[in-house]
């Protein structure tokens, strides 16, 4: 399918994962406005990279990493058709290969890393291999993703990811091993009156892993927030409207 946003267009017909509300929420909520060097892991159609480009200062550089051949072609096409063809650069390959090359070349770390990751560690996989890789941790496990974040994120940087409820605990439990913690967590409720079914995490380096815990260096705490997408009548909430107004045509 094709999706037209206020400032760019996305063709995702060849991608394992189509444009989704999850991705739009992630791209709209992530704190990108002060970032000058952004990494999009598993870029797919390039949606998050282009949302980041729209929200970022003109001097920002963005690297979109995508391993799937068809998705990489779609991503490159969407980038070239956008107003930010000079801002967003595509790396076609595995994030592990990108990390190794990046570290070997002693290139600058990233102020912000954004990722809508494969999140199912178990369960029935789609017959389409591209969709299976996009949904399951076949090519990028939670541990591998967190290791990449720990290696490529600048000391004061933030990584933003979105996960369904069933994957949240497993992901968070592994963060400490890589010197990371959840600074902010946005729990998302699809319809008013329901329970949250996915969360966006703002991940940062854990300062207590580098320095002993003291009165002046207390244990880090997570800030918890919550938003509802639609009310009981199916209308977008004011929070949803405010968040997505810069992107959705009809808001």
From Swiss-Prot:
Q: Name one GO cellular component term.
A: cytoplasm
Q: Which compartments is it annotated to reside in?
A: Cytoplasm
Q: Which GO terms describe its molecular function?
A: nucleic acid binding; rRNA (adenine-N6,N6-)-dimethyltransferase activity; tRNA (adenine-N6)-methyltransferase activity
Cysteine disulfide partners in this protein: none
Recite the UniProt keywords alphabetically.
Cytoplasm, Methyltransferase, S-adenosyl-L-methionine, Transferase, tRNA processing
Report the superkingdom from the record: Bacteria
The primary site where this protein sits is cytoplasm
| BP terms from Gene Ontology | tRNA processing
As its record notes, the protein acts as a catalyst of: adenosine(37) in tRNA1(Val) + S-adenosyl-L-methionine = N(6)-methyladenosine(37) in tRNA1(Val) + S-adenosyl-L-homocysteine + H(+)
Q: Name one Pfam family in it.
A: MTS
Task performed by this protein:
Specifically methylates the adenine in position 37 of tRNA(1)(Val) (anticodon cmo5UAC).
* Full protein name: tRNA1(Val) (adenine(37)-N6)-methyltransferase
To which species is this protein native? Shewanella frigidimarina (strain NCIMB 400)
